[in-house]
Amino acid sequence: MTTASVIGAGSWGTALATVLAQRGIEVKLWCRAPEQAAQMAASRENRRYLPGVTLGELITPTADLKATVQSGVILCVIPSAAMAEIADSLAKSQVPQDSILVSCTKGLERGTGRRMTEILSASLPDNPIAVLSGPNHAEEVGRQLATATVIGCNDQDIALRLQEIFTLPWFRTYTSEDVAGIELGGATKNVYAICAGISEGLGLGDNAKAALVTRGLAEMIRLGTNLGGAPETFQGLSGVGDLMVTCYSAHSRNNQVGRMLGEGKNIDAVLGSMTMVAEGVPNTVSFYEAARRAGINTPIIDQAYAVISGHKSPDIALNELLNRNPRPETDS
């Protein structure tokens, strides 16, 4: 394979383009804004979203979607709210039927609860679909720091092909057939990262943060298995691995959102101060809705939703979590 396309030139899309280029693959990196494509082509750097990382000569920034999609592998690295629009645009752009579509977006569709691969499959039913997810901060991948990730696909031959494409001495790739579990783990952890950030903003210590993250994992498994994921997947890189890096890293946008909420800022002010999308905010609403539809007990998601929607202050939400009726640890 000599060509690949990356739809979305944010920090993660740009970082993945550099991974592919290091494998000797020609990469078309699609930007929604023509001026961004021109800036990146001229400076060989994504100054807005991934400054300091040089774009190799095999990476071609472009704003021409139809020309971009004529590749063997197409990575979709866009905000979850835009996935349905992009999927429809890809279908209209006559994507080759043998092109492998890989979702690298962590979220659920608002209102429907559809996973990103389900959205892609609905618009492009004849194409093979996969997911790539794990504890992967773009800033570290761009600097070629040691990283591991998971590729999920129902077709293991395709998963193995993608594994080969994405493997570098410093970028280790595993495979899995549990597409749903991989996607659900990667999306739910964004909610718990906001909660971990709230605990920091409130000035609580490591004990409280560790409790939130651990109970968040239990809640992730409880909800995720009900929505179609395998329990063991949530114990892997795309589950607990991604949860840890997102809750504890300074790179985490969702953690930053939570920290500012805990410090007393309202959600509009928080989001207005950010240049990149924090998926945990729409994810919180989507998983709150999904849990209600499924009848699953999700006390942490419930309180996160109450804070984000402005119904409760962070300190009241935390107090209600701490003062739930006592129960065995293995109970929900």
Question: What does each model-found stretch correspond to?
Answer:
Residues 103, 128-133, 173-177, 235, ...:
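General beta-strand structural signal in soluble alpha/beta enzymes
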Residues 10, 14, 34, 62, ...:
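Electropositive phosphate-/nucleotide-binding environments in soluble metabolic enzymes
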Residues 1-53, 62-63:
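NAD(P)+-binding Rossmann beta1-loop-alpha1 motif at the extreme N-terminus of oxidoreductases
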Residues 189, 196-200, 225-235, 239, ...:
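NAD(P)-dependent Rossmann-like dehydrogenase/reductase catalytic/cofactor-binding core
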Residues 82, 93, 119-127, 146-233:
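Internal alpha-helical scaffold of NAD(P)-dependent oxidoreductase catalytic cores
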Residues 55, 61-145, 162:
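Rossmann-like NAD(P)(H) cofactor-binding subdomain of soluble oxidoreductases
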